[in-house]
Amino acid sequence: MKARYLFPKDYMADPSANVFNGRLYVYPSHDWDSGECFDDDGGHFQMKDYHVLSMDDVMEGEVTDHGVILDVKDVPWAEKQMWDNDVVEKDGKYYLIFSAKDYNGVFHLGVAVADQPEGPFIPNADPIRKSYSIDPCVFKDDDGKIYCYFGGIWGGQLQWYKDNKALKCEHLPEGKEDPLPSRVAMMTDDVQQFAEMPKPVVIVDENGKILPADDPHRFFEASWMHKYKGKYYFSYSTGDSHYLCYAVGDNPYGPFTYKGVILEPVVGWTTHHSICEYKGQWYLFHHDCVPSKDTTWLRSLKVAPLYYDEEDNILPVK
């Protein structure tokens, strides 16, 4: 089946898809043309609010825009750049985990809470303690434990940190050095803080060797976790090589063995996604810049069916 542009009426990106109460919800970032010039630190991505979309027929049905669910002006600690977000449910409450810059220009992760998946979400006064960087994915395992995956290089500031501590000088690994990994931390029972210090998400090849910094399939940003037949599928963007890739592990922390490319480079610099099952069918949600004629900060949501082969490998999405 041909891919669908999910919401042509507006520019949105970085979709996080979740199923709540039998309906599929997509939590994207919200692009607009701020007039900022393109730069490698993402200054042209000046998103300032979040919407949520919902539907009960992914490929052909009506998509409802529930409007603004959180605005940067309502977040006490955040100044600008409401980048990626995700939502998880626990005990009838909905927790939106999002990334934004504080008044010192530093990215952190925040929490906002709602009584229903379409919001509105009420933000906490402060970001998650010890949080940094961008691109949160919140994954609820079968035992009810909730994990937050996060991290992004360059504009996402992951190179500013090592062992969860800020560096005096940023470090971007090169060549055969180990790359900068995504991070994962279990959340507290109230989904307000990290329950532990974040751990590196290690991606290895079939021989158990860490993919090096110069491998075009190494992690860059856009962590996503889903579970399929008891295995943990960690997927991610490779950033400057523009792939969506995935790796598979036996537990939420990994290590994860690299398996392959899900999506080849699209029109536009970034590629960011989520993977979700709804009504027995798996889907890949992502974005590209075809409708905006390759204006990289004006992206459009897209969805396509996703399939596995008989060995549980994800088939590339065309």
State the predicted function of each range.
Residues 1-318:
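Carbohydrate-active catalytic/glycan-binding domains of CAZyme proteins
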